[in-house]
Amino acid sequence: MARNSRIRITNNDKALYAKLVKNTKAKISRTKKKYGIDLSNEIELPPLESFQTRKEFNEWKRKQESFTNRANQNYQFVKNKYGIVASKAKINEIEKNTKEAQRIVDEQREEIEDKPFISGGKQQGTVGQRMQILSPSQVTGVSRPSDFNFDDVRSYARLRTLEEGMAEKASPDYYDRRMAQMHQNFIEIVEKSFNSYWLTDELVERLKKIPPDDFFELYLIFDEISFEYFDSEGEDVEASEAMLNKIHSYLDRYERGDVNLDLKGF
């Protein structure tokens, strides 16, 4: 393997080095003064004599040029009316993730709106009609993120919450986890509502065998598969033996393959 020969510093190198250092220091000073952001630890300014090879110098030069390049949005900043400062890269990333999270929710709602809504064993319209009467988030348990507007952010804590939350919600895995958590929560609330009751125990065992994505669709379609009829504190429980039997009948239909579930892989 060929060795990189030691650099021979030319007058052009000296002039370029001086220019890059000047531009970098000006960028650091300007950013600190205008936005209160100290970038001095983001970039190194070693003495010209410290470079051992031409490759080292060229790599340093590339970093300086990138740092001062106006197209590099990691180091371009915006301050809103509340004095909150963020890089354009961060703002764009939150906007991108927000739009992706909205797209996923919109796609999900479109997939489920024509599904039947069944209460008391009879169809009472569609899931889409129910979303119009209530709200989509009430029906699905999943809210659609609002548009991101940096001008509305009043604190860095809020900005961090939005950044982390939208990054999470932009991932389809997030909704898989939500379905799994909803499934587990429903099983637990059924268990706690009646403590120990043979019909409930049997229902819990049947529910545990259902994949979370299938449970989510059953939750959307069948009115009685609802958190509002069960109470983990044992008070104001509306669930009765008749209702439990109705849920068992729905699970019978599911196990026979009589319920159209087509959100697999959503």
UniProtKB/Swiss-Prot annotation:
Which SUPFAM superfamilies does the record cross-reference, listed alphabetically?
DNA terminal protein
Task: Provide the positions where the record notes the PTM O-(5'-phospho-DNA)-serine.
Answer: S232
Q: Which Gene3D superfamilies match?
A: 6.10.250.960, DNA terminal protein Gp3, priming domain (1.20.1270.230)
Say if the entry is tagged with keyword Phosphoprotein. Answer: yes
Keyword match Nuclease: no
Region described as Priming: spans on this chain = 173-266
Keyword field: Covalent protein-DNA linkage, Degradation of host cell envelope components during virus entry, Degradation of host peptidoglycans during virus entry, DNA replication, Early protein, Hydrolase, Phosphoprotein, Viral DNA replication, Virion, Virus entry into host cell
Tell me the protein's name: DNA terminal protein
State the organism named in the record.
Bacillus phage B103 (Bacteriophage B103)
Specify the taxonomic lineage: Viruses, Duplodnaviria, Heunggongvirae, Uroviricota, Caudoviricetes
